[in-house]
């Protein structure tokens, strides 16, 4: 899978999630608000993203009803490692190991790789920042996990592995 930056304007940014030659989802971020609109085969959703914390920053995602769905936390700013909590489950991630531009998501014990996703098409802005929370990385990661781990997307999760 890979994220592709489609359009970056003054008022919005649009990204697409691709698996091979098939578009899986489209997400558009409003630069004026903290909301994002997601369109996928699962329907249309609106998520809100909040940055929290000072010494240990994290990004929290809430659904359209304001209910917390999950969060991303970076182990150390600039480390490219951290954890994702989504629907009560914990996952660990490593981003850009060996300058690959790819993210690998593991189970809680780091025994099994659950998915790999390329951020090469959107990582120009990621390389210029000290923390992964200075850009849309955490939001894209949360949407990627949400999409992949939908209960009715078992075939999508198997295709990713």
Stretches with model-predicted labels:
Residues 57-85:
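Helix-adjacent hinge/juxtasegments
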């Amino acid at each position: 899978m890979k994220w592709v930056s489609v359009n970056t304007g003054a008022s919005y940014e649009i990204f697409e999630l691709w698996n091979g030659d098939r578009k899986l989802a489209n997400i558009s971020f409003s630069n004026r608000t903290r909301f994002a609109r997601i369109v996928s085969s699962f329907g249309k959703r609106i998520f809100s993203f909040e940055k929290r914390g000072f010494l240990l920053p994290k990004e929290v995602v809430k659904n359209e009803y304001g209910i917390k769905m999950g969060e991303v936390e970076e182990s150390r700013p600039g480390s490219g490692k951290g954890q994702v909590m989504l629907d009560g489950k914990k996952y660990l991630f490593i981003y850009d190991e060996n300058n690959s531009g790819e993210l690998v998501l593991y189970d809680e014990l780091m025994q099994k790789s659950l998915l790999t996703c390329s951020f090469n098409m959107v990582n120009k802005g990621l390389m210029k920042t000290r923390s992964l929370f200075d850009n849309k990385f955490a939001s894209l990661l949360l949407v990627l996990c949400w999409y992949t781990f939908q209960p009715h997307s078992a075939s999508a999760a198997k295709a990713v592995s």
